[in-house]
Amino acid sequence: MENLADELAAAGVATLRYQFPYMEERRRVPDAPAVLTATVVAAVRAAVKEAPDLPLFAGGKSMGGRMTSQAAAQGPLDGVRGLVFFGFPLHPPKRPSTKRADHLTKVTVPMLFLQGTRDDLADLGLLRPVCAKLGPLATLSVVQGADHSFHMLKRSGTSDTAVLQQLVQTVGSWAAKIRE
């Protein structure tokens, strides 16, 4: 995520990175959902305070994105114009389900889902209908050959750096449309 944040910044997209308490404390077991969503809300408030004049989009990688969506489903996140998910974890590995997406119908801002075709935590055959159900609020951008961390197989001929640039360009273009 650090490289992604750096590349987004280079493209003119400011980022605020944060960690959940369990990560800060180097624990393996995640905090309770209430703690995770409260952390998201606190991070959004900090971003608004630090950069009140910038357009604000919230999101994250994997569980960070899912917890951001859960916080947004509980009520609007002040100042947030849209949500960006880098590898939305739709289900645990090898246990396909859409239950983790049930709350997304309560999110009221546009959502960008960035997913790799080799993502073990999001079967695209399940994610596509989830996004379709969300209608114009959901945009799905698929990265051919990328895994959950957006890494590519060497034999693909596409570098991780190229994928990173693709993600940055997609986020920038999508955010520009939302700001209009």
Predicted segments, located by residue:
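Conserved beta-strand scaffold positions in the cores of enzyme catalytic domains, especially
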Residues: T15-R17, L83, L140-V142
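Conserved alpha/beta-hydrolase "acid-adjacent" motif
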Residues: D120-L126
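Catalytic histidine neighborhood in serine/cysteine hydrolases
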Residues: K133-M152
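Serine-hydrolase catalytic machinery in alpha/beta-hydrolase-like enzymes
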Residues: M1-L56, Q70, F150-G157
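Short beta-strand/loop motif that positions the catalytic acidic residue
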Residues: V107-T108, F113-Q115, D119
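Catalytic active-site module of serine/aspartate enzymes centered on a nucleophile-bearing elbow/loop
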Residues: K154-E180
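Acidic beta-to-alpha connecting loop that harbors the catalytic carboxylate
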Residues: T117-D119, G145-D147, R155
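Primarily recognizes the serine-hydrolase "nucleophile elbow" in alpha/beta-hydrolase
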Residues: V40-V109
